[in-house]
Regions:
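Nuclease catalytic cores
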Residues: 1-79, 83-86, 104, 127
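Nucleic-acid nuclease catalytic cores
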Residues: 72-139
């Protein structure tokens, strides 16, 4: 994966809504870490992800925890996003590059940990960042 894909992943992990996303992108441009053209490329990638029906629903109607460390029995976990309401919890991890079985294993560890913490009905979702973003759901 290229540098812009990694920046897109970082932005997705941090921003919980469009206003935050725009603010972070503007800061990145102001600091000179990305050009205007790169900002547009990232913005287009983010829009294609935020327009996915499931992701859009989570953003607009679920509580969100972003990149928070969770420590259980000396193990440290840091899911990219946790979307939750009274009925369900979706743990989303953003991935660059090729699919790997270790990705599911990582998110299954998150699911187990979140369940122990009392979050309702946890499930996992891998979001692969590519030209066409792809969500992969599992329990």
């Amino acid at each position: 994966a290229d540098e812009l894909t990694y920046r897109t992943k970082a932005l997705l992990s941090k921003a919980n809504n469009k206003a935050e996303m725009d603010k972070i992108l503007a800061q990145m441009q102001f600091l000179g870490s990305i050009s205007t053209a790169q900002a547009e490329t990232i913005l287009n990638s983010l829009k294609s992800i935020w327009e996915l029906p499931d992701y859009n629903k989570w953003l607009s109607s679920y509580s969100i925890i972003s990149e928070r460390d969770i420590s259980v029995n000396g193990q440290l976990y840091r899911p990219d996003k946790i979307f939750y309401n009274e009925e369900e919890t979706i743990i989303v991890d953003f991935k660059t590059g090729k699919k790997s079985s270790t990705h599911k294993k990582q998110v299954r560890n998150y699911i187990e940990t979140i369940a122990k913490m009392g979050f309702p009905n946890p499930s996992g979702c891998l979001l692969y960042l590519s030209d066409i973003p792809e969500l992969e759901f599992f329990k």
